[in-house]
């Protein structure tokens, strides 16, 4: 599927509305837009981690796959489930259970060799770890926004992007620990 952007501004949103992928127009304050904007921000936070954190190639590959998935999540959130507009050139992009299963596999792969935690982890340590913690917290907000959109638009917004974001924040936590190579910065209660 090719995407061609010939012009960035359109002026169609200057009245406070924007178009969903089914060509309907909604207020820019619609919770679906909040959710996919938060996915976009999560994607940007991951991009900063990639640019400044110097991850190894395996983690880079994982994070770049996630960045692609986050675009799919945004497309899913902007496409009503009962969308009747079908264009074979532009198939609907949906988060599926396969996306979630892949995140769970990565969680298991990267978490298994880590030492057991005896306290909560403070964001920090290496630059990559700190940046992944920022991405994790943005992903948590995106998840809350996605659940709010599901609740506000029952039967219209899929729950799978919210589930994906839930698992994504878990993976980002695990990867932040991997980035600290076993030297987690631990919370000292009352410390």
Swiss-Prot record:
Cellular component, GO, one term: cytoplasm
EC numbers for this chain: 2.5.1.17
Example of a GO biological process term: porphyrin-containing compound biosynthetic process
This protein's UniProt keywords: ATP-binding, Cobalamin biosynthesis, Cytoplasm, Nucleotide-binding, Porphyrin biosynthesis, Transferase
InterPro entries xref list: CblAdoTrfase-like, CblAdoTrfase-like_sf, PduO-typ
Binding site residues for ATP: 10-18, 28, 140-145, 166
UniProt catalytic activity: 2 cob(II)yrinate a,c diamide + reduced [electron-transfer flavoprotein] + 2 ATP = 2 adenosylcob(III)yrinate a,c-diamide + 2 triphosphate + oxidized [electron-transfer flavoprotein] + 3 H(+); 2 cob(II)alamin + reduced [electron-transfer flavoprotein] + 2 ATP = 2 adenosylcob(III)alamin + 2 triphosphate + oxidized [electron-transfer flavoprotein] + 3 H(+)
Pathway membership: Cofactor biosynthesis; adenosylcobalamin biosynthesis; adenosylcobalamin from cob(II)yrinate a,c-diamide: step 2/7
Compartments (UniProt record): Cytoplasm
One Pfam assignment: Cob_adeno_trans
GO molecular function per UniProt: ATP binding; corrinoid adenosyltransferase activity
Recorded family membership: Belongs to the Cob(I)alamin adenosyltransferase family.
Protein name per Swiss-Prot or TrEMBL: Corrinoid adenosyltransferase
């Amino acid at each position: 599927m090719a995407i061609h952007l010939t012009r960035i501004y359109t002026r169609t949103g200057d009245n406070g509305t924007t178009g969903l992928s089914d060509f309907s127009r909604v207020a820019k304050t619609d919770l679906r837009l909040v959710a996919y904007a938060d996915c976009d921000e999560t994607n940007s936070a991951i991009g900063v981690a990639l640019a400044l954190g110097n991850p190894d190639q395996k983690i880079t590959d994982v994070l770049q796959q996630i960045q692609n998935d986050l675009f799919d999540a945004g497309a899913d959130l902007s496409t009503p489930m009962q969308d009747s507009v079908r264009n074979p050139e532009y198939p609907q992009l949906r988060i599926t259970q396969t996306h979630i299963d892949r995140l769970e596999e990565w969680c298991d792969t990267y978490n298994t060799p880590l030492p057991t935690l005896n306290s909560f982890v403070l964001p920090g340590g290496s630059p990559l770890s700190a940046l992944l913690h920022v991405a994790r917290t943005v992903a948590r907000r995106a998840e809350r926004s996605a659940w709010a959109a599901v609740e506000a638009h029952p039967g219209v917004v899929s729950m799978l992007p919210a589930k994906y974001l839930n698992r994504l924040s878990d993976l980002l936590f695990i990867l932040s620990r991997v980035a600290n190579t076993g030297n987690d910065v631990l919370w000292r209660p009352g410390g």
